[in-house]
Amino acid sequence: MSIITDVLAREVLDSRGNPTVEVELYTEDGGFGRALVPSGASTGEHEAVELRDGDKDRFGGKGVLKAVGHVNNEIAKAVIGHDVTEQRLIDQTMIDLDGTPNKGKFGANAILGVSLAAARAAADEVGLPLYQYLGGPNAHVLPTPMMNVLNGGAHSTNTVDFQEFMIMPVGAKSVREAVRMGSETFHALQALLKSKGDITAVGDEGGFAPNLKDNEEAFELLVEAIKKAGYKPGDDIALAFDVAASEMYDAESKTYTTKWSNPDKKYTTEEWTDMIDGYINKYPIVSVEDPIDENDWEGWQTFTKKMGDKVQIVGDDLFVTNTDYLKKGIDMGVANSILIKLNQIGTLTETFEAIEMAKEAGYTAVVSHRSGETEDTTIADLVVATNAGQIKTGSMSRTDRIAKYNQLMRIEDQLGAQSLYKGRKSFYNVKAID
């Protein structure tokens, strides 16, 4: 038994230069844990509350001194004296103390910082790597990465409608090889853009946002880059994309629109599904995220019924890492995968519960970063601890993204012959892929 003796939070900066919460936690036997909390730009309507100060004279209102204050006062008083290894009890203590359904009193950014710092301190206390402390001796599966190399939608100034275009090294034999394949394809894509006279500046997640006209051109460019890097599209490297459909849905008319490429064009849910199906039939696509609006549950049913056997369908804004929404989706036969974002729900315990529920229902789980990241590498350890099998952590640039890939390679080296990279077999619940 090792008792928590001190908890300290401070305001630091994330990868966008915006304030975020950092927490340090200490135990009586010398255990130490530090965690930094990420932040999303496009957030789901039902996510846990990220508490900001609202003081326009500091960071344009984005300061987090209120959240920091809650950690250093109410939360610290509540968790000091607890056994640092009692993760569920620590998390539940904070949830009860907050007393709101969405962590609106203290902020998920305050609560999550303490939750993660406690786990790190406990791992330090017992002398184990974080992934092994959290996952035990069976933590051994290295994830197949989703690498966001091209951006559109709200993440860019071009006229591409879908928000993220990703490559997945499904044919790699190890995470180290997957990272190399991704890096080589990223640089091949950069060379192609330069040859076309297009911009090669990168966005928040390290991907390019060139002046492309539509989704079709983005998919074609990725296929060309994969070939240029010396790989076979589909066999070696497959494609994935995030539609971010809520950005293009009109609830009143129940229609979708190609908001950026052709805003006058309207689609019913069936027509929208057929449009996406056309891309999936034409290109080596294995995964699609948020293809339907987060509140259009009937639309999700329609999409899943048609597409569920041929592609991974990931719910992000739909599920917001929340077991209540995930259970509803499972009961309704909606999606077949969940995106896992720690700060959407706000504690490590609740994150584990969402992953467990997904697996029990035959859904895959994709552990994900946020657009506002830090040097914190917890998600790399989490994805191995849970044997989730897939990770979404940005492109092959920007240190805040690369830090996670580097940590995965370290973990793979530590595991040695015990490690397993599943690649294409990560999509175990999709008949047309596995």
Curated annotation (Swiss-Prot):
Function, as annotated, reads: Catalyzes the reversible conversion of 2-phosphoglycerate (2-PG) into phosphoenolpyruvate (PEP). It is essential for the degradation of carbohydrates via glycolysis.
Reaction catalyzed: (2R)-2-phosphoglycerate = phosphoenolpyruvate + H2O
Which residues does Mg(2+) bind? D242, E289, D316
- Return the Gene3D superfamilies for the record: Enolase-like C-terminal domain, Enolase-like, N-terminal domain
Protein known as: Enolase
The record's keywords, sorted A to Z, are: Cytoplasm, Glycolysis, Lyase, Magnesium, Metal-binding, Secreted
Q: What is its EC number?
A: 4.2.1.11
Which Pfam family name is an example for this entry?
Answer: Enolase_C
Q: Name one GO cellular component term.
A: extracellular region
* Lineage of origin: Bacteria, Bacillati, Bacillota, Bacilli, Lactobacillales
Organism from which the protein derives: Lacticaseibacillus casei (strain BL23) (Lactobacillus casei)
Compartments where located? Cytoplasm; Secreted; Cell surface
Family statement drawn from the similarity comment of this UniProt entry: Belongs to the enolase family.
Q: In which pathway does it act?
A: Carbohydrate degradation; glycolysis; pyruvate from D-glyceraldehyde 3-phosphate: step 4/5
**Keyword Secreted listed:** yes
Secreted listed as a keyword? yes
Q: Name one GO molecular function term.
A: phosphopyruvate hydratase activity
Which PANTHER family does the annotation name?
ENOLASE
- The EC category is lyase
Question: Could you say which cofactors this protein requires?
Answer: Mg(2+)
Its GO biological process annotations read: glycolytic process
What CDD domains is this protein classified in?
enolase
